[in-house]
From Swiss-Prot:
One of its GO terms (biological process) is chromosome segregation. One of its GO terms (molecular function) is centromeric DNA binding. It is found in: Nucleus; Chromosome, Centromere, Kinetochore. It comes from Saccharomyces cerevisiae (strain ATCC 204508 / S288c) (Baker's yeast). Disulfide bonds: none annotated. Its main location: nucleus. It comes from the Eukaryota. Belongs to the CENP-W/WIP1 family. This is Inner kinetochore subunit WIP1. One of its GO terms (cellular component) is nucleus. Transmembrane segments: none annotated. Component of the inner kinetochore constitutive centromere-associated network (CCAN) (also known as central kinetochore CTF19 complex in yeast), which is composed of at least AME1, CHL4, CNN1, CTF3, CTF19, IML3, MCM16, MCM21, MCM22, MHF1, MHF2, MIF2, NKP1, NKP2, OKP1 and WIP1. The gene is WIP1.
Length: 89
């Protein structure tokens, strides 16, 4: 094998190694993105659950205020609704 053929062979091998490294980097980034996505989904699920709890409490507080003939919800309505929610769990 002459020098030029050897140089071409080595360049091809280096190019293949670079492509393999690019592929490995791409796969690693995809795995990191999937992990980040899973963490985001967990946080989103917790936020949705928290929002549902707050909505339930606020609707109960509004019902309590309406039962008293009031148009506004006062802090004691929210406190009573929160306590009722906690007691039901």
């Amino acid at each position: 094998m002459d020098t030029e053929a050897l140089a071409n062979y080595l360049l091809r091998q280096l190019s293949l190694d670079a492509e393999e490294n690019k592929l490995e980097d791409l796969l690693q980034r995809q795995n990191e993105d999937q992990e980040s996505s899973q963490e985001y989904n967990k946080k989103l699920l917790l936020a949705c659950g928290f929002q549902a709890i707050l909505r339930k409490i606020l609707l109960d507080a509004r019902t309590r205020a309406t039962a008293e003939g009031l148009r506004e919800v006062y802090p004691y309505h929210i406190e009573a609704a929160t306590q009722a929610f906690l007691d039901s769990q």
